[in-house]
Amino acid sequence: MIGNRSLSVIDPNAVLHVEEEESMSAKSRLEGILLQLMKVEKAHTSSDASRQYYVDLHKDRFSDILRLCQFYVANPSARVLDIGRSELTAYLLKYYPHVTTLGLDLHADAGGHREASSMETVPHITFDLLNSHRVDIWPKCKSFELIVFSEVLEHLSVAPEFVFAFLNSLLAENGILICTTPNAADVAKRLRLAYGRNPFERLRLYSANPGHIREYTRQELCDIACSVGLQCIRQLYFDWPQSRGGSRIKSACMKLIRAYPPFRGSSVAVFRRVMP
């Protein structure tokens, strides 16, 4: 007894229990925040609405790529491989009946670029391009006269040499590979950088549908593909997709600036197999 008051004995286990409860409560709140952020992101990038928006926005790209394919591989009976099943596959099927797709498991793939058309009869090779560095597990299949590799490369977090080497292994002799990808040196990105804004996409929360991990310049594409036995026979630029809405004056100015091809938003490279 000190001054007629007894000393309280604090139980350290009780204090620890309270701290653990507070910590768990904080973690639960943060988990809820992250889940909500992911939900919003998935609605924007991976929902049925976002899929249809993507299809509508990229119709011109699909048509242009089909024309480019027809120019380099005119034979409609050619064996064609489309990397990453999407609505582009449906466009290719309009001319080439023998189209196969390659990519993630169709039942597990929740990406926002998936097809809107029915394609149950189209053959599919299940292979994750992130495993391209594993030469021992490359799928064994027939060769293809034409491979379409459109708007996929920028989503991959693996050295592109592995991917291009894998695709080279699937090409028939003198086969054609058409690659399209965002132009890392697009004038819009240059302007954003000049204003102190990061021109490239942030890493996404929903890893099943990654955004753009790495974009490439025209010269990079050529150097990478040529290093693994492909010959670049043509490079060109397109302005895909055409922006919607916004100021007419701004749109007119951007159209004028992008009359200079290297300032356009999309880079296209056509490769031929020269090394078995």
Q: Can you say where each PLM-predicted feature lies in the sequence?
A:
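Active-site flanking residues adjacent to catalytic metal/cofactor-binding acidic residues
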Residues: 81, 104, 150, 182
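Glycine-rich phosphate-binding loop signature in dinucleotide/nucleotide-binding domains
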Residues: 72-76, 138-142
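Conserved SAM-binding motif I beta-strand of class I
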Residues: 99-105
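S-adenosyl-L-methionine-dependent methyltransferase catalytic module, highlighting the catalytic core
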Residues: 3-4, 9-68, 87, 106, ...
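Conserved class I S-adenosyl-L-methionine
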Residues: 76-86
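A short beta-strand submotif of the Rossmann-like class I SAM-dependent methyltransferase core
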Residues: 146-152
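Structural signature of beta-strand start/N-cap positions in the alpha/beta core
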Residues: 79, 100, 143-145, 176
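Conserved SAM-binding loop of SAM-dependent methyltransferases across substrates and taxa
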Residues: 86-98
